[in-house]
Amino acid sequence: MVILSNVSLFSCCNISQKPSLFSPSSRSSHCPIRCSQSQEGKEVVTSPLRSVVWSLGEEVSKRSLFALVSASLFFVDPALAFKGGGPYGQGVTRGQDLSGKDFSGQTLIRQDFKTSILRQANFKGAKLLGASFFDADLTGADLSEADLRGADFSLANVTKVNLTNANLEGATVTGNTSFKGSNITGADFTDVPLRDDQRVYLCKVADGVNATTGNATRDTLLCN
């Protein structure tokens, strides 16, 4: 029921008002809306038109809700939007299970893969400059020939990863980053700040020369 207070959208006919002496039936026949007094003194619409008013109100509410939802989707945080995993992203990549996904050869500069599960994902030859793999699980992933300059592998699980001929110049691998079982043949670790135990382990398996930079893996690791 629609309550009209202060300003009415329609003029109401008081049902308690006496009919005119000159036209006894004029009010009953020409007044589309009748009103009665509520206990609080407010006029209450009692005519059949109230259903029309109610329907209009519902329609306005639905349109308002649709506009609100549309606006929220339009202004969503670019970092989490469908094409906003990074400046050159192709999909949502942060905090996702992307196991086995194929990113080979793609340009994913500064892509955000934080906390994502990337087991057996294929990044062969991908451009991943400045990408973040913070606390991500890259177990068994293929990063061969990938450009990983400036990438962040802090706390990442890089176990059994193929890093053949990957360029990791200036990458971050602090924390508990693990390279256990990874293939680093020809990988370039120039200016990568490694812990002593990480360096010792990698030097045991280091071999080859990076096909792009021409740097020997052992030299970039500062192995003795």
Curated annotation (Swiss-Prot):
Question: Does this UniProt record's set of keywords contain Ion transport?
Answer: no
> Which InterPro entries does the UniProt entry name for this protein?
5peptide_repeat, At2g44920-like
Q: Which UniProt keywords apply?
A: Chloroplast, Plastid, Repeat, Thylakoid, Transit peptide
Subcellular location per UniProt equals: Plastid, Chloroplast thylakoid lumen
Pfam families noted in UniProt: Pentapeptide (PF00805)
Say if the entry is tagged with keyword Chloroplast.
yes
The stretch of residues making up the signal peptide is: none
Transit peptide boundaries:
1-34, 35-81
Q: Name one GO cellular component term.
A: chloroplast thylakoid membrane
Using the UniProt record, give the first listed, main subcellular location.
plastid
Q: What SUPFAM superfamilies does this protein's entry cite?
A: Pentapeptide repeat-like
Superkingdom in the source lineage: Eukaryota
Ranges for domain Pentapeptide repeat come to 116-155, 156-196
Cross-referenced PANTHER family = THYLAKOID LUMENAL 15 KDA PROTEIN 1, CHLOROPLASTIC
Q: Which protein, by its recorded name, is this?
A: Thylakoid lumenal 15 kDa protein 1, chloroplastic
Q: Which organism is it from?
A: Arabidopsis thaliana
